[in-house]
Structure formats: C-alpha cells, structure tokens
Amino acid sequence: SFRGMDPSHVALIDINWPNTAFEKYKCDGDIKFGVRIDEFSKLIKRADKSNAIEINISDDNMLLVTIGKNKKYKMRLIESSASDTPLPKIPYDSKISVTSSKFDKILGDVQVVSDYLEVKTTDSQAEFSGKGDSGEVNIILEENKEELTEIDSKTDSSGTYSLEYLNSIIKAVGTTVETVTCEFSSAKPLRIEFKVANLGRIHFYLAPRVES
C-alpha cells in the first residue's frame, strides 16, 4: 500500500495493491519507506507499456528500481509519516458512479468558467456546476448505464472542491479505469475511488472549499 498527503493537507491518496497484482512478490516483514512523489513518478514514466518494473530496497536504504532489462535506478528514501496518517472516517450520505470519460469531460466543462467544482445530489440525479467572473455552468445527470451508472443518496448533499486537485488525479490515473466513484456529504471531504482493472484500488480524499 502507498499513502501520501500534500503539504497543505488538502488532499490524501491511498493506494492498495494486493500481492496477487504482481507477477512476483516477496516481503519478509512490514516495511515502511518514503519517496518523493514527483521524482518517483518521473522515474516510473520512463517505462514503456511492455516493460516489467522491479522494485527493491537495498541494505543501504536505497530504493532500487529496474525497468525492463537494462535500466536500473537508485533513489534515496526519505523520512515520511504519511503512512501513519489515519484515513478520514466519514459516514457519507451520497454516492455516485460516473464513467471516467464523462467525469473528465465534466471537469473540463466546468474549468472554462471556474476553479472549483460544486457537486449536488438528490435521490434521482447528480448536478455538477461552477461559477466565476466570466460566467457559470450547470450539468445535470440522471442515472443511466452510459454516464451516471449509479446514484445512492440518503439525503440531498452538496460540496465544492478544487478543480486543480481533481484534474491532477484524473490525469494521473488516465484511462486505466472505466468508472469513477465519488462519495461525499455536505461540507465534508470528497472520496473518489478508482478500481484499476483487477489489480487494486485507489482512494483519493479531497477537502472541501471553505467559504470565507
């Protein structure tokens, strides 16, 4: 599992891959280590789709990454308390599932006029909106198999969240998932779940915008 929080404590990501997701997995005991996400991401992106990636930790506390047959990297580990950060325990009132392509399009549509996405749900529909100096946009989806594949709302809920953070995680996950599942309650952190094929899942938590 991998867990990381941004410096401003606005976003938290929690990734869980079972050992069955790997071709080969060996771990003699619990090990905690920290890496710089920006550096680690750049390194992993050097791999082609056909490349195998092997990750080890050396005796001198270095992360060893082998890409394919001829690329070998060493990365210095860092002290990190992110893995000890407890996950938010929130009783969510609303849950919606949207195809990843539709969710990406919604973010792009709202970003034309706003830096924030407001999400509202009732028992039968989800509403995505944004407002800025140049104008406003409102997008309503009703449950159907093509776009809004699931909606479950115990009570009407609404929350406003940063598009900068949302766009970053959607671009990072890319086309590896078909559906994006969002859970939230009014004025509470948003939780987005991505299920990556049959390999594992990613949970992304995002604090709501606080009106001053």
Predicted regions and their residues:
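Polyanion-binding surfaces on beta-sheet-dominated domains and ring/shell assemblies
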Residues: 117
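DNA polymerase sliding clamps and clamp-related checkpoint/processivity subunits
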Residues: 1-112, 120-212
